[in-house]
């Protein structure tokens, strides 16, 4: 339809008159019993009747040829608009003229809405019939699909506000479609892809591309429903009487749900989407009058049957509504009786409450008199209390000063405690550091243990040497003691011999006097013997002194050896103490090693569990990816028909009798035998099936990643 500019009735008649293109397209004839109806202003239903009328109207057919009805509608429109203009001219100027103009524009908008809604019904029906005959897959060259987009564009442009800018006036339906991106996040992909198309230069082209993509996604009805549900946002773009703002918008959304059955493959590249708005081709929906003359009786019968079914359905609906209303009336009568009972109870309660109110007033007066008396008494009491308060305040001030001092002392104590706490925290950190150092010390003590063992072995060897030396010294001491005892015996013998000699000398001296002569002779012999004996005595004295010196030196050596033995005993006791400490450290080390082994076992078990969990997770992720790809393959990849493909997708060679067509069971596209000679097992097929080269390499990479 051409855009309306508002004016005389003749102009409106020209706009509503359909432009017929020569040459009938596919599906140019309607079935018998179908018609397209252009409604007059007087026949328009109210907004409340639209909801109930849409259900039976879906089953209704069209009962007259569209051309005659279109001419009749244009005549009615011209007559009604002419009468409206004459009435406006007769009333003359001011507010009355504006009111009639507004009423005329509202009527015009209502007629346009009804015509567009019926046109949308026709275009969707013809599109579905042609799609069913062709196999439910459509492309951009399909004539009913093109006409559907033209009608859809007219519906979206109906009642659209004109936006003024510095460049000029702009009237495009892409503005409200952009709101879908904010209301429905799923539509963001469509909006971004439309904006990124470099071929589109105008907002009209972007809006058409958006409609193409939404139809291919099978979500056109959902997106438009979201828009219509948010009419407060649409009011910025549309007039209040626009199609998208009224009930007809919801009807069109319900009709668009049926298009989700179709598969549309529309290529946006190479399409001139920025061109002017197309004209609706009524040749797709028209039949010749000659063809319709033969089926008039059949049409009348079908009309009568349809009207009969419609009346029966209305009767059923009305009987149901009557029953519902009867039940509602019964419920309302019951509630009314209950409310009357409650009202009587409420009136009785009000009377009792009024009596209680009078009693309370009398009690209030008595309480007031008593309160006045009590106020005088309390005044006297307050004076006494003031004096006591002043006295107590002085005491409280003193108490406050004492408490303030205590508070200061407690603050000091608190600061000291905080310092101690900080010290304890420091000690705790030092303990943690000491624990770490202990671990280091254990390693160092292990090294010192090895060194101490070596030192123990050396000390044992030294002790053995010293023990042997002590034994040798004791044996030599025993020998020397024996020699001393022998020398003492010899000296005793010499002393006894000396005594004997002295006795002999005395005898000799006595005998000398008696026998001087004999002694004089023997004196020389005895003198020589005495000198020899004296020499022997001196030698024996020298030997005794040397033996005594040797004894002293041996005693000193013995004492030194005893000291060394005592020192060695002390060192051995210290070493034993250290050995005991080392044994305690060994026990601690063993306990720590056992704890370490247990912790290592727990760590290894946890690592094994983590590895197993990682393997399970990786396997589950791979399974999820396989399932997602299978779902994508089931959802996204369209199974191409043999008629749609003329060339191989990979090598782009034309199919012939020798070069046959083969489907890839993974992506659904058609390839030649050389490009799809591989076979692989897929999750959706139990046996190995034919796969193209690209899918074969991709599946092999995935299998290798899962195996690794």
From Swiss-Prot:
Which of the residues bear the PTM Phosphotyrosine? 389, 400
Q: In which tissues is it expressed?
A: Broadly expressed, with highest levels in lung, testis, kidney and brain.
Region spans: Disordered:
1-57, 493-522
The way it spans or sits in the membrane comes to: Peripheral membrane protein
Outcome (variant: residue 400 to F) = Abolishes phosphorylation and endosomal targeting
List where this protein forms a coiled coil.
Answer: 321-374, 405-617
SUPFAM superfamilies found in the cross-reference section: FYVE/PHD zinc finger (SSF57903), RUN domain-like (SSF140741)
Spell out the Basic and acidic residues composition-biased ranges: 1-17, 500-522
Which compartments does it reside in? Early endosome membrane
Q: What is the effect of changing residue 389 to F?
A: Abolishes phosphorylation and endosomal targeting
In what residue span(s) does the RUN domain sit? 139-271
User: What is stated about domains?
Assistant: The FYVE-type zinc finger domain mediates interactions with phosphatidylinositol 3-phosphate in membranes of early endosomes and penetrates bilayers. The FYVE domain insertion into PtdIns(3)P-enriched membranes is substantially increased in acidic conditions. The 2 coiled coil domains mediate the interaction with the dynein-dynactin complex, the RUN domain is also involved in the interaction. The coiled coil domains also mediate self-association.
Which Gene3D superfamilies does this UniProt record tie to the protein? 1.20.5.170, 1.20.58.900, Zinc/RING finger domain, C3HC4 (zinc finger) (3.30.40.10)
Q: Mind telling me which SMART domains this protein's record contains?
A: FYVE (SM00064), RUN (SM00593)
Q: What is this protein called?
A: RUN and FYVE domain-containing protein 1
Q: Which UniProt keywords apply?
A: Coiled coil, Endocytosis, Endosome, Lipid-binding, Membrane, Metal-binding, Phosphoprotein, Protein transport, Transport, Zinc, Zinc-finger
User: Which residues in this protein are found as Phosphoserine?
Assistant: 620
- Annotated binding of Zn(2+) 2, by residue: 664, 667, 692, 695
Per UniProt, subunit arrangement is: Self-assembles through coiled coil domains to drive ELVA (endo-lysosomal vesicular assembly) formation. Interacts with BMX. May interact with SSB. Interacts with RAB4 and RAB5 that have been activated by GTP-binding. Interacts WITH RAB14 and RAB4B (GTP-bound form); the interactions allow endosomal tethering and fusion. Interacts with ARL8B (GTP-bound form); the interaction is required for RUFY1 endosomal location and promotes interaction with RAB14.
One of its GO biological process terms is: endocytosis
Q: Where is this region: Interaction with RAB4?
A: 615-625
Q: Which GO terms describe its cellular component?
A: cytoplasm; cytosol; early endosome membrane; endosome; intracellular membrane-bounded organelle; nuclear speck
**Gene Ontology MF term list:** identical protein binding; lipid binding; protein-macromolecule adaptor activity; SH2 domain binding; SH3 domain binding; zinc ion binding
What processing steps or modifications follow its translation?
Phosphorylation on Tyr-389 and/or Tyr-400 is required for interaction with BMX and endosomal targeting.
Q: Which Pfam family, an example, fits this chain?
A: RUN
């Amino acid at each position: 339809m051409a855009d309306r500019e508002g004016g005389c009735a003749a102009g409106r008649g020209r706009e509503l008159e359909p432009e017929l293109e020569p040459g009938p397209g596919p599906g140019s004839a309607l079935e018998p019993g179908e018609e397209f109806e252009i409604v007059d202003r007087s026949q328009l239903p109210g907004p409340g009747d639209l909801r109930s009328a849409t259900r039976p109207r879906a089953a209704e057919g069209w009962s007259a040829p569209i051309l005659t009805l279109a001419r009749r509608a244009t005549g009615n429109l011209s007559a009604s608009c002419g009468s409206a203009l004459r009435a406006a001219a007769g009333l003359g100027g001011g507010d009355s003229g504006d009111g009639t103009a507004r009423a005329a524009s509202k009527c015009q908008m209502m007629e346009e809405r009804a015509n567009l809604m019926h046109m949308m019904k026709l275009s969707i029906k013809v599109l579905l019939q042609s799609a069913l005959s062709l196999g439910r897959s459509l492309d951009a060259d399909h004539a009913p699909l093109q006409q559907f987009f033209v009608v859809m564009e007219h519906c979206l442009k109906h009642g659209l506000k004109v936006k003024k800018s510095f460049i000029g006036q702009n009237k495009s339906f892409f503005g409200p479609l952009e709101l879908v991106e904010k209301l429905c996040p799923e539509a963001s992909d469509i909006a971004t892809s439309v904006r990124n198309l470099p071929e589109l230069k105008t907002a009209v082209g972007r809006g058409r591309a958006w409609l193409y993509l939404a139809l291919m996604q099978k979500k056109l009805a959902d997106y438009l429903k979201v828009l219509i549900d948010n009419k407060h946002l649409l009011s910025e773009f549309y007039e209040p009487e626009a199609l998208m703002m009224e009930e007809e918008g919801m009807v069109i959304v319900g009709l668009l749900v049926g298009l989700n059955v179709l598969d549309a493959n529309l290529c946006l590249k190479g399409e001139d989407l920025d061109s002017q708005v197309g004209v609706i081709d009524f040749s797709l929906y028209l039949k010749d009058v000659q063809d319709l003359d033969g089926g008039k009786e059949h049409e009348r019968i079908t009309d009568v049957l349809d009207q009969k079914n419609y009346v029966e359905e209305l009767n059923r609906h009305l009987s149901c509504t009557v029953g519902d209303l009867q039940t509602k009336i019964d419920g309302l009568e019951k509630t009314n009786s209950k409310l009357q009972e409650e009202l009587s109870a409420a009136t009785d309660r009000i009377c009792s409450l009024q009596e209680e109110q009078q009693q309370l007033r009398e009690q209030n007066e008595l309480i007031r008199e008593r309160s006045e008396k009590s106020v005088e008494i309390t005044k006297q009491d307050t004076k006494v209390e003031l004096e006591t308060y002043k006295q107590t305040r002085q005491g409280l001030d003193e108490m406050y000063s004492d408490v303030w001092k205590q508070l200061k002392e407690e603050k000091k104590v608190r600061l000291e405690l905080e310092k101690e706490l900080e010290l304890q925290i420091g000690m705790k950190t030092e303990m943690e550091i000491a624990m770490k150092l202990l671990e280091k010390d254990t390693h160092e003590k292990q090294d010192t243990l090895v060194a101490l063992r070596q030192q123990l072995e050396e000390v044992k060897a030294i002790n053995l040497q010293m023990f042997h030396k002590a034994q040798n010294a004791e044996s030599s001491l025993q020998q020397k003691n024996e020699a001393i005892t022998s020398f003492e015996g010899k000296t005793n013998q010499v002393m006894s011999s000396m005594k004997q000699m002295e006795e002999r000398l005395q005898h000799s001296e006595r005998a000398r006097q008696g026998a001087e002569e004999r002694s004089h002779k023997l004196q020389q012999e005895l003198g020589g013997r005495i000198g020899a004996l004296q020499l022997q005595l001196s030698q024996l004295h020298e030997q005794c002194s040397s033996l005594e010196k040797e004894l002293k030196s041996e005693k000193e050596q013995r004492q030194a050896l005893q000291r060394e033995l005592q020192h060695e005993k002390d060192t051995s006791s210290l070493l034993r103490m250290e050995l005991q400490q080392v044994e305690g450290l060994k026990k601690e080390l063993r306990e720590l090693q056992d704890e370490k082994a247990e912790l290592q076992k727990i760590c290894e078990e946890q690592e094994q569990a983590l590895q197993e969990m990682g393997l399970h997770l990786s396997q589950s992720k791979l399974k999820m990816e396989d399932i997602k790809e299978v779902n994508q393959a089931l959802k996204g990849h369209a199974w191409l028909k043999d008629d749609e493909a003329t060339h191989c997708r990979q090598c782009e060679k034309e199919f012939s009798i020798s070069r046959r067509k083969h489907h890839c069971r993974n992506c659904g596209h058609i390839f030649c035998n050389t490009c799809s000679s591989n076979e692989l097992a897929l999750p959706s097929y139990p046996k190995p099936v034919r796969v193209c080269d690209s899918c074969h390499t991709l599946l092999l990479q995935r299998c290798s990643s899962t195996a690794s």
